[in-house]
């Protein structure tokens, strides 16, 4: 995939959710996730499928107050991002590392790394 197309997919992905629930574009997000999409993260583990990822991201975005991109690295169809999110539940600022694999104009894989301690506490009070 050309770098410009990869860049377009990445920018569209973050645009679907980075500004919180009021501008969350669920249809746009679903349209950019490949049929063989797989998500991996510290709370959900490794899960195939668009539905569980979309619903999980939507739940997170409901708590999102702000997002600041810190760093981006790209290598062909793969990209890595480091960003901070301000969230209301659990309250605070949390750092995330996210790795995307893109092909044919769609996202095939998202791997998310973050300290899930406070999120687990909030999910199981």
Question: Residue spans of the language-model regions?
Answer:
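C-terminal and inter-domain tail/linker signature
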Residues: 1-125
């Amino acid at each position: 995939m050309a770098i410009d197309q990869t860049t377009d997919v990445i920018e569209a992905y973050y645009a679907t959710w980075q500004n919180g629930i009021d501008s969350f574009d669920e249809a746009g997000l679903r349209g950019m996730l490949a049929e063989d999409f797989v998500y991996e993260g510290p709370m959900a583990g490794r899960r195939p499928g668009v539905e569980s990822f979309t619903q999980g991201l939507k739940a997170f975005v409901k708590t999102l107050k702000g997002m600041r991109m810190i760093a981006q690295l790209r290598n062909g169809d793969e990209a890595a991002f480091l960003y901070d999110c301000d969230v209301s539940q659990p309250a605070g600022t949390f750092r995330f590392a996210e790795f995307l694999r893109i092909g044919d104009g769609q996202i095939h894989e998202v791997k998310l790394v973050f300290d899930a301690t406070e999120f687990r506490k909030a999910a199981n009070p």
